[in-house]
Amino acid sequence: MGVAPLEDFNQQRPTEGGVPSERTQVFIRYDNDALYLGARMFRAQPSDILRSLSRRDGSATAEHLQVTFDTHRDGRTGYAFKISAAGVQGDFHHAQDNEMRGREAQYDPVWEASAAIDSLGWVAEMRIPFSQLRFPAADRQEWGFQLDRWMPDKNEDLQWIVIPTKETGYISRFGTLTGIAGVKAVRPVELLPYVASDAVRAAVVDQANPFRNPTRTRVGMDAKFGIGSNLTIDATMNPDFGQVEADPAEVNLSAFETIVEERRTFFTEGAQLLRIEGPNYFYSRRIGAAPHLSVSGDYVDQPRASTILGAAKLTGRTASRLSVGALLGMTGRANARVFSVDSNRTTSTVVEPRTEYAVVRLEQELGKQASTFGGMLVAMRRDLGSYPTLTARLASQAYSGGVDWRIRWQQGKYAVSGYAGFSHVEGDSLAIGRVQRSSAHYFQRPDGAYLDYDPSRQSLTGYTASIRADKDAGRRILWGAQVSTETSGYEVNDVGRLQSAEDVDYNADIQIRETEPGRYLRNWRLGFVSRGSFNYGGNHTNAEWQQSANLTFLNFWSLNLNTRLDPSTLDDALTRGGPLMRTGLSWGQDYRLNSAMGARTGWRANYNWGRDALGGWRSAFGGGITVRPSPRWQLSLDPNYQRSTDSRQYVTTVTDAAATATYGARYLFAYVDRVTTSLKTRVNYAFSRSLTLEGYAEPFAASGRYHGIGELRAPRTSELRRYGAEGTTITRLADGSYAVTPQGAAFTLSNRDFNVLSFRSNVVLRWEWHAGSTLYVVWQQNRRASEALGEPVSAADLLNTTRAAGDNFLALKMSYWLPVKGRS
């Protein structure tokens, strides 16, 4: 390569193709071991450079330079490296031809970089070893190549090759890097052994508890092996995730599980190659989740999570444009220990069986338009042994998978995509009966005879399919339309995620946009969406109409306005296994205002409200502010406060032959007045680029008061017969429960009012003490208190969360990177 620097940059933002406000020069060199990049970023006022110091991959709010290589020249995958003006490194891997979607920040190669600010602006140097890149074996390399400089104080994004914002594609539009010759492709072998120790300290210690204050020490290892120039095996043995941030608190009154984000690095890295657009065949949080069973006794040592004995995955993309993702994992049998005071004995009970998982995903790219055809297969097997409590609860085997496709033309402007898949679960009739009665199916619905509920069934098979058409590019109008379905027997919740089967879903959307700056706005977008569902009985079970407006002002502030209308439909899940019930017409709006993305002090504010025709309502305030008082400090506060009344909250089902109008059962509902408030807080301090202290805390308070209890008057209606009228009685007892006398057998309802306080925090000292090697010191708190009061909580209760009883978790983990010379 010549001596002349690369400096012909142009704006992508704020004005596509515009002249840069500042000059940039980049030089590239290489030797047998590494590629070197030197850069000069000019600034007329160097004091304006944002240079916040943070941990690795945390430089989004600082001015930075990024280089991305498409080493296989496939127009789809890429390796990105960036350096901020403060010298903070960042890196990620692109698994798709998209700047943001499919970008994996968990990609952490070992490379070197430095930066310095001077009177002309700032300079940067990078050294990227060829061992950290995968590229084909060839005498002369030809790579896709892109440079990007981000100046947040100006909201200005400069690119060497300007990527059009009105069209699809990112990596496929890169320029070309040539001139690298005589470099050998290396198949890396990297080992990362670790040692960790942790201890739990309860706030209130019962000295008679033999399981008090447990302490553990363990060792494990991660490993990475290169296969050829395209594929990589990652393996982990006895992994430790003690440094991972805790999940947020909530009070879930629905019939459906809460889906939480995956934060464990082994499962997030390469995750894009283990999923498809559409069916959630694989939900990695299933591996190593909390045991399905629990035990009771005088003193109990209940495992918080199943132990992952080991896992391995194969990821990459071959020269023939075949993307490969495969994962194998095994969790060990989990035992809970119970100590009996009377017998002075400790017994052990199996609460989770040994379980094996397998996931395979292949996707072949076809033709010049980058159309794709792929397939996926997921399998799970549990060793239930001779444990009747396990066989009655859990399926022994589960399989799912299918094929998917995306046909593109006019360079991705138009596309038709779809999928077709299956599921199959096997197990004891009691376990399969639980699946049939679960919230995803409700086979037992008395008005759903076509569902064929069979309590003797020992397996369940179902299918899913979808077809979608999209216009993904163009200056002014984008649109999409989709129809999808899941049959009643479709079930993937052993390894994947499914909220509801037996649906025919439809979705149509159109967007009208302007990406060029105007007199008052930099850009704007209007969207209209209609979506909904029918079940296989022909009932319209869900409907939603939504209109949105997204505006970006000349000062880079943005305003989002959303209006939603949900027509009345017949819901097949509200009665939780009972007959269809009509929902009320509901409507609402959401307003969001955000500061400029590159502001030194960033903020956002939002308000949303909703109403329904049955007397329900919602009003919620939220927001956030991020303050950087100095380059080393960062403080973020995200307050939220919501008041609502749910007009049809399910309470319980009471069997009563006298309730002939509702198939011999009474389906009870109530109004619930709810208040929820929380304050997510983050405080980060960077001692240096390699030594950081990060703190996270979330005080959370919630309350709920049930009133207006009644029973569904008739199927396919929303009408309730309120207790205390029409010849019925309801009496509040001294313990808070209710004695109810309907027009039939009397019964008692427990007190469901609640006040919940929760405080979860996570403080992590992270020191990258050697290249690729890290020391973590972690302190976590998990405090919780609950009472059956139903008194509205307020912001003052957030202080009370810190005084609730709970546990302190202390952990120390040290890893050491051991590169083994790979073969070429």
How does the language model describe each region?
Residues 33, 43, 75, 120, ...:
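Short coil turns and loop connectors of transmembrane beta-barrels in diderm outer membranes
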Residues 42-43, 72-74, 150-152, 196-200, ...:
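Short, glycine-/Ser/Thr-/acidic-enriched flexible segments
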Residues 26-28, 37-39, 65-69, 81-83, ...:
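Generic structural hydrophobic/aromatic packing signal, biased to beta-strands
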Residues 18-20, 59, 304, 395, ...:
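A generic structural micro-feature
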Residues 307, 315, 415-417, 421-824:
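Exposed, low-structure sequence patches enriched in small/polar residues
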Residues 1-365, 371-375, 384-387, 804:
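Structural preference for beta-rich elements and adjacent junctions enriched in aromatics
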Residues 185-234, 360-451, 509, 516, ...:
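Surface-exposed extracellular loop regions of Gram-negative outer-membrane beta-barrel proteins
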Residues 210-211, 254, 302, 346-353, ...:
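Alpha-helix capping and helix-loop boundary segments enriched in small/acidic/polar residues
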